[in-house]
Curated annotation (Swiss-Prot):
Gene: rpsF
Protein name, per record: Small ribosomal subunit protein bS6
Function summary: Binds together with bS18 to 16S ribosomal RNA.
Lyase recorded as keyword: no
Membrane-crossing segments per the record: none
Cited SUPFAM superfamilies: Ribosomal protein S6
Keyword terms of this UniProt record: Ribonucleoprotein, Ribosomal protein, RNA-binding, rRNA-binding
Keyword rRNA-binding among record annotations: yes
Gene Ontology molecular function: small ribosomal subunit rRNA binding; structural constituent of ribosome
Biological source species: Chlorobium luteolum (strain DSM 273 / BCRC 81028 / 2530) (Pelodictyon luteolum)
Length: 133
């Protein structure tokens, strides 16, 4: 029997759809994963963003990120179903290996929350005043 591995799936849903249609598309993606034998561990709805380039003549997409565990043969079945969904502009399923997970932990550990541009200007002004004294 095949062991389950950790995967992440990022989808871009047509941003021109109503919020209800986008939510229905997200439910559909989650349903496909669970029906094919996957177990979802987290769902992150990133929201509407401008795409870097037009995809199927669309420039706005609603991004979502799903982490799940599944057996390797199941991934091909999930991709086969997602490939023909018209509301999905793009999808990508990636196997999360140990080096990727370790890198993610390091990034989370050392990441710094950057404030607003006004905060940065104020801190630079304060630093300049301290140097001048």
């Amino acid at each position: 029997m095949e062991t389950n591995k950790l995967y992440e799936c990022t989808v871009i849903i047509d941003g021109g759809l109503q919020d209800e249609a986008i939510a229905a598309a997200m439910e559909m993606v989650q349903k496909v994963i669970t029906e094919k034998g996957g177990s979802i561990s987290s769902v992150l709805d990133i929201g509407r963003r401008k795409t870097a380039y037009p995809i199927k003549k669309k420039t706005i997409g609603s991004y979502a990120h799903i982490e799940f565990t599944a057996a390797t043969p199941v991934i091909a079945e999930i991709e086969r179903v997602l490939r023909y969904e018209e509301v999905l502009l793009r999808y990508l399923i990636v196997h999360l290996t140990s080096p990727l997970l370790e890198m993610r932990k390091r990034v989370e550990k050392y990441s710094v929350v950057i404030g607003s541009p006004e905060d940065n200007v104020a801190s630079e002004t304060d630093a300049a005043d301290k140097v001048a004294k």
